[in-house]
Amino acid sequence: MKKHRSDPLFEPLIIKGLTLRNRIMSTSHASGLGDENHMPGETYQRYHLEKARGGLALTMFGGSSYVSEDSLWASGQLNISTDLIIPHLQQFSESIHAEGAAIMIQITHLGRRAEPNTQNWLPAMAPSSVREIGHRAIPREMDQQDIQRVVKVMGEAAYRAKEGGLDGLETMAHGHLIGQFLSPATNKRSDEYGGNLENRCRFGLMVHEEIRQQVGDDFIVGMRMSIDESAGGGSDFEESLQIAQIFEREGFLDFFNLNYGGIDTERALATQSMPGMSVPSAPWLEPIGAFKQEVHLPVFHAAKIADIATARHAIHEGLLDMVAMTRAHIADPNIVAKIQRGDEHRIRPCVGASVCMGEQRPTCMHNPATGRERYWPQKIKRSNEPQKKIVVVGGGPAGLEAARISAERGHEVVLFEASSALGGQLRMATGVEWRKDMQSLIDWRKNELAVLGVNVRLNILAEADTVLTETPQVVIIATGGVPGTGWIEGAELCTDPWDVITKAFKPTGRVIIFDGTGRHVGPTLAEHVHGNASSLTYLMVDDILSKELTYGERIIWRQRFAKMGIHPKGEQTLKSVKANGNALEVTCVSELTGKIWITTADVVIADTGTVPVDDLYRKLQQTSNNNGITDVSAFLSGKNQLDMGKPGMSLFRIGDALSSRNVAAAMFDALRLCHRL
């Protein structure tokens, strides 16, 4: 293992007797992996264990772990309001410590962010009855008994964290109950808990005093807070600094975990506190660094720090004490280990796609094993069986990942790609400026295929003879799909959406875009058409724009549509397109009223997904030993698909060659099929 004495990332940090082995960490986040009893079971623990094995210094877990039953919002949240969690924490901490890493939890009361319709139907409460847009509850105002109760249960939760063998904890003041008392936007009280800054700090200080009484002086306690929420009417930089200095003065804290902006709207989440692909790298490092100069406690920070160069800069320049690469570790939990062995160039980069913040959190578009470590491997093991010859046809996401995993298994892999470049449909996604980082999904795999010795053959439209000449034991068809509009009457009059996205055709005049999927294609078309068309009508089958995407992607498209002046018309069905002189007559139906309406256009572009390119698959079926059939049970359970008793070639298809889905599905197909081949 290489020594990195000159690397600032590998300088240990000591906090109250705890030595953190390097400066890289993962912050607490709501992974959604808690079990049915809101406990950190095996699935939850394995997710964090991979990061510890990968070499980071500190993994923090349990984002929004609730201290009482009126602080719920999601089924996967952890419940630290009961002693039942202690054995789980003990097991958890032992496994993380065995890998040389430290472990801490976040405890909180959500206040107005609690969702009253979740499980127990208790009303949300807050310092004042000020509604939050994001979680939508109208909270009741807390009375003195509520305040005393929350102070007490926060202390009890902290005691459980210590009994569980954890190294420390953080409270969540950023947008949660403590922060709601701190902020003038949410605290409208006129008693001793509201008004001036000292009063607004009172509740938070009471909480931390109680925590310190419960855990003693040796246990590490920090607070997560925003350094500037002024855009939402909250505390600005100067007042936030005063808050931090007040808490420092009282001596209850050992570190600050600092963020920027608000969390009360999708826009604030996607552009401020958890910035995605549309935001530049590490947008808040400079203001966080300025804040750090005015406090004395160690400072942690996470916000789109996705590359090692930026992380090194943050530590070297004294902007941070611990650099949190949370989403970067979702993409690759082995970041530190790869640096240590000289493989920094092989780190799988986070592209900021925000899939990990969606309903399937913490899954990663780039890394299908994340969040599924209990069943699917982060590290592909080399096969103990004789090497096989595997042919992959198609160099899109599914084909690239299938080739990579098969090569990791030690097999001889040949990949055929019909075009002059790898990437498939992903190459079109990078054509929109704010999504250009998607190119990293292609580039990383290209590099891995080169390292692993995959024989990549471009500009070859593989036919059956092309494949069979290779005498493979396994053939994987990953030929993707092409736009399919066959169900629309007059589909032949519609313009191919890919021709527009690739700029092979520039629509002008009156343009209608029909978005029948709720994915990226429709809005991407709008970006390409806007400015060239004399008029643009955007119709969609869904009630909201980009419905199939995560909130972090939806809000960016909505912002861009607002800036372009595009007003999408929802719940519409495109029925037919007919020629009418030099124009097109377009017939639509409102799903709300059933009313048929007709308009005219010069160009109609419809996105209704893709249909599989499966001609080659059909031709090879009869020559395969499995008739091209995938054993679904084996596929789901991760078992080997191959019947070693049968001679000849086994044939499979994955990704859009099977069905029109997304990149994450294509990657997962490849993992499930190939990791046991």
Outline where the language-model segments fall.
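A conserved short coil-to-beta-strand element within the FAD-binding core of flavoproteins
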Residues: 458-470, 570-584
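Short beta-alpha connecting loops at secondary-structure transitions
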Residues: 270-277, 321, 426-434, 542, ...
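Rossmann-like dinucleotide-binding cores of NAD(P)H-dependent redox enzymes
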Residues: 412-452, 520-521, 525-574
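Flavin-dependent oxidoreductase catalytic cores
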Residues: 1-393, 397, 401, 405-408, ...
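Rossmann-like dinucleotide/flavin-binding elements
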Residues: 384-418, 422, 458-471, 478-551, ...
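Flexible, Lys/Arg-rich cytosolic regulatory linkers and terminal tails that connect or flank
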Residues: 351, 357-369, 373, 564, ...
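Hydrophobic, well-ordered secondary-structure elements that form the walls
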Residues: 256, 291, 314, 326, ...
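Short acidic loop-to-helix transition motifs that present clustered carboxylates
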Residues: 306-309, 330, 461-464, 500-502, ...
